[in-house]
């Protein structure tokens, strides 16, 4: 199989990378009706598999889970999750031939084996669904001509997909139809109904492409979402301890600081996050972020280039074939880091202290978000897609670090994201070593000294923050989500 993106000519590549349209609410007036009365069989019962299935069932769809015979015989976790929630469970051979829509929600590295197992069992004219397009775009999986191939990609972990649905809302979602597999022209109707069944239409849906989803998703998770948080955690912890800060305090400031800082990001973008700082601290964070962007721009560009060319996927799939040797080695190295093993700290850190003592962390978030966004735009990805794959998902990833440090983040994200995270963070840490020696008092674990504020300089900084393109598109998208949430709650 050949990388699908690399088989396209330049015009086709640019067209698919740039596919992104914010869909209006009235396009979902039919909600999930197109799939009602049809059989939906989900393969995989992990976080996305279970929680999407629960939402779809609550939306009136007929849901069953197809598992491998050994998973059923051995009553594995996937079997227990499905049966304990009252779902029909059966083997591929028993359920797949009945399915009008087969939804593949297994991990990326299992996709080829799963698709090759289910495809011969699928009836003529059925549909195959994904929530991430890696198998189609990077692996280049060929699907039978009569099968419609669609994608519904919630921009949140599976648990969040369920919780937002239970609140009467949903999570922002990308949908797409594979242009090589839509013989009956019903792909968009299927994708819209599936998205509505998960609640995504109540939070905002982008009509995208498999290519745009994969390339932007890989870029976001490797750089700002995971790689930058991991590199920042390791660097900031080691710096504080070397400067004599109590290890427990340093660890807690980082572990819970990312979540606190990015909560402001979620509510009001980079503007609100920076507004949580004093004026001298804001000016210092801005200066630090500009330095960081200059240093790291080549690394962000390299990751984007390797994603676009397919080099990243080729390298990672070679590690799959080598029993994940690199992935498992890097995971072990991360687990042995000083930050992962810092002593518990019983003292209290106030919400504002996370900002006041985490000026460098704020700068890292700002630099990483803007660099990821700008680099995606330069590669032809549309602003809305770039926003969702950089700023929007960052608070969700930061929350995993707050739970159990980097270990939890790397367990929750996909193996694909984890592999890319290590590539980025292991390059970023040495790249920023010299920069870390230039830090001043107040950049970490102390307040920035108040040495006066230049009004004109502050004015220019505020204007630069607010006029960055991610702030402009972010304000629009957050406003839409807020409006939709009000409608959902009112209903």
UniProtKB/Swiss-Prot annotation:
Residues reported in the UniProt entry to bind Mg(2+) 2: 217, 389, 393
Stretches assigned to the KARI C-terminal knotted domain: 209-344, 345-484
Keyword Repeat: yes
GO biological process: isoleucine biosynthetic process; L-valine biosynthetic process
Gene source species: Proteus mirabilis (strain HI4320)
GO terms under cellular component: cytosol
Limits of the KARI N-terminal Rossmann domain: 17-208
Known pathway: Amino-acid biosynthesis; L-isoleucine biosynthesis; L-isoleucine from 2-oxobutanoate: step 2/4; Amino-acid biosynthesis; L-valine biosynthesis; L-valine from pyruvate: step 2/4
Enzyme class, spelled out: oxidoreductase
Molecular functions per Gene Ontology: ketol-acid reductoisomerase activity; magnesium ion binding
Binding-site residues, Mg(2+) 1: 217, 221
Active site: 132
Similarity field: Belongs to the ketol-acid reductoisomerase family.
Keyword Oxidoreductase set for record: yes
Cofactor note: Binds 2 magnesium ions per subunit.
Binding of substrate, residues: 414
Signal peptide positions (record): none
Cofactor(s) this protein requires: Mg(2+)
Catalytic activity: (2R)-2,3-dihydroxy-3-methylbutanoate + NADP(+) = (2S)-2-acetolactate + NADPH + H(+); (2R,3R)-2,3-dihydroxy-3-methylpentanoate + NADP(+) = (S)-2-ethyl-2-hydroxy-3-oxobutanoate + NADPH + H(+)
Entry binding sites for NADP(+): 45-48, 68, 76, 78, 108-110, 158
Protein name stated in the entry: Ketol-acid reductoisomerase (NADP(+))
Keywords: Amino-acid biosynthesis, Branched-chain amino acid biosynthesis, Magnesium, Metal-binding, NADP, Oxidoreductase, Repeat
Pfam families: KARI_C, KARI_N
Purpose: Involved in the biosynthesis of branched-chain amino acids (BCAA). Catalyzes an alkyl-migration followed by a ketol-acid reduction of (S)-2-acetolactate (S2AL) to yield (R)-2,3-dihydroxy-isovalerate. In the isomerase reaction, S2AL is rearranged via a Mg-dependent methyl migration to produce 3-hydroxy-3-methyl-2-ketobutyrate (HMKB). In the reductase reaction, this 2-ketoacid undergoes a metal-dependent reduction by NADPH to yield (R)-2,3-dihydroxy-isovalerate.
